[in-house]
Curated annotation (Swiss-Prot):
Region described as Glutamate 5-kinase: spans on this chain: 1-296
Protein's name according to its UniProt entry: Delta-1-pyrroline-5-carboxylate synthase A
Assigned protein family: In the N-terminal section; belongs to the glutamate 5-kinase family.
Binding site for substrate: 60, 157, 176
Binding-site residues, ATP: 196-197, 236-242
Organism: Arabidopsis thaliana (Mouse-ear cress)
Keyword annotations: Amino-acid biosynthesis, ATP-binding, Kinase, Multifunctional enzyme, NADP, Nucleotide-binding, Oxidoreductase, Proline biosynthesis, Transferase
Region (Gamma-glutamyl phosphate reductase): 297-717
Catalytic activity: L-glutamate + ATP = L-glutamyl 5-phosphate + ADP; L-glutamate 5-semialdehyde + phosphate + NADP(+) = L-glutamyl 5-phosphate + NADPH + H(+)
GO terms under biological process: hyperosmotic salinity response; L-proline biosynthetic process; pollen development; proline biosynthetic process; response to oxidative stress; response to salt stress; response to water deprivation; root development
Pathway: Amino-acid biosynthesis; L-proline biosynthesis; L-glutamate 5-semialdehyde from L-glutamate: step 1/2; Amino-acid biosynthesis; L-proline biosynthesis; L-glutamate 5-semialdehyde from L-glutamate: step 2/2
SUPFAM superfamilies: ALDH-like (SSF53720), Carbamate kinase-like (SSF53633)
Amino acid sequence: MEELDRSRAFARDVKRIVVKVGTAVVTGKGGRLALGRLGALCEQLAELNSDGFEVILVSSGAVGLGRQRLRYRQLVNSSFADLQKPQTELDGKACAGVGQSSLMAYYETMFDQLDVTAAQLLVNDSSFRDKDFRKQLNETVKSMLDLRVIPIFNENDAISTRRAPYQDSSGIFWDNDSLAALLALELKADLLILLSDVEGLYTGPPSDPNSKLIHTFVKEKHQDEITFGDKSRLGRGGMTAKVKAAVNAAYAGIPVIITSGYSAENIDKVLRGLRVGTLFHQDARLWAPITDSNARDMAVAARESSRKLQALSSEDRKKILLDIADALEANVTTIKAENELDVASAQEAGLEESMVARLVMTPGKISSLAASVRKLADMEDPIGRVLKKTEVADGLVLEKTSSPLGVLLIVFESRPDALVQIASLAIRSGNGLLLKGGKEARRSNAILHKVITDAIPETVGGKLIGLVTSREEIPDLLKLDDVIDLVIPRGSNKLVTQIKNTTKIPVLGHADGICHVYVDKACDTDMAKRIVSDAKLDYPAACNAMETLLVHKDLEQNAVLNELIFALQSNGVTLYGGPRASKILNIPEARSFNHEYCAKACTVEVVEDVYGAIDHIHRHGSAHTDCIVTEDHEVAELFLRQVDSAAVFHNASTRFSDGFRFGLGAEVGVSTGRIHARGPVGVEGLLTTRWIMRGKGQVVDGDNGIVYTHQDIPIQA
């Protein structure tokens, strides 16, 4: 669902384009040509050529292709004894000479099939020092472009006088980013496109889920914020080289976009002015606002505020809604004034009467909205209701309770009253909310959002409800499947279809099992050892097995921590520690807290208290099953109430998180997702369920010695 980006509008008017294809795009995993990607690239360039664009291609790949051919020839001509000898590295210049003809032969074959003529031009950096060379280069390229020929440039590595090595420790290809930037400047290109193996420039390694894609690079803002990861598996410089080349070209007046060469349509999207990849532009620092992080920050803030909302009492949540209703009526004049500006703009723009009618916010409609909010406030609190209570076994009680979904993203069209309805439903159901209304109601939505968020107490925060003001932010939000739980598009079928096709987030319209056991300072030691051992050892590969053991810091002093560790290690469990536990226990540090071992191994970490455990689970858990072992009832209830997982247990092994053991019959799977509602969605449709289990130290132990009763317990009103 890419949208036109105003800062990219210039791309629709370019004529001369330099496209550089990186080695990681040219080749596949085995070092061979990626025929599918290159074929798609040639088709895009041929289409641009026929549409009147002047296309110049800079392609890497010769060294690698030559190395592959020479190695094959060596293998064919080697005896068995030769193969046992250490293999020497092939000379990069020889590889370049052999591979260049193969690379060009492929391009000629592909372009011939597309009825396009291509030409090869090999250059060296020293040549550009010659003024006559640069003049002749421009004349030759101009003649080719006038004849609709696509020039294909590469550095002439075979006779290059560079002293730098022609290979690195991780790959086989050379890099042409600086050559592409140089050619773009020398040939007066309107745009340089650098095709990479990632979507663009990220704030950190692209594999890191916390890394954010930078849409517009601002040197003053981003230069010190970026952490580069490993360079390309094949190329010489990777993203570092691309950024340096892009900055040099952009500050000299040539706009640059780094984007993925893996998508067959990205060049076309760039030229349509869509927001793909990372833009480098000499005027970028003058554009405001720079909103690269707004989408994620807004979603994370909504989630944090929703947890604060859920922690309030039922009466306090009710009061928020009543205050909102009062605020709506108190601000009728202001709301009406802003709404009239929207209506006037819509009429001036020639919108259909039916759409204009939906825009209108009369005093009567505002009063009606306030009344509906009060009615919602008077409803029974939907959060934390016990829906079912079961005695699983003697002394082991299971409750099914209602719980908020989390963070909702609602995309709706030109009905400002929908904002009030959706916001009040979200607050009643304890959810964080992000809203994107139609541009026709921009002023109305803004004032309604302000009135509502001003009525939310500081203990929760106005960021509970975020208002998305630009369509350009929607694609970013749709990528945030780690912080947004449900998308509800309210609009045309096209809108719903577009969103469904461009997001991993569940869409309501027309996993990992990283389970935690937290052992509190008030635990029964023997019970803790039984539960921890059972949670890890009863079936280590199960998704409900313990993967992380969290221990209260006080247990280090009274030797309980050592007893828990011994119980695991004596049964063959390999332990890895967090930063704190690895030093205390002298065990290897875990690579990540977000790791599911599915084996006789787990992570151990020491936390300050129950709040530290809850925070750790929220940051590193998968919302599957988490358990607390404690004799402190208040601490247990705090944990059960605040841990936002599908199943939360007190004094019971995580292995009980199973359809059969819950008395549900056969199990299809364990879902950590939250989508479930069908039909008209009110408060109930914005809720999910959680399982709360209270036990007395029971363990599964292969179901030996436990009698399942599965008796329904009456729910007290």
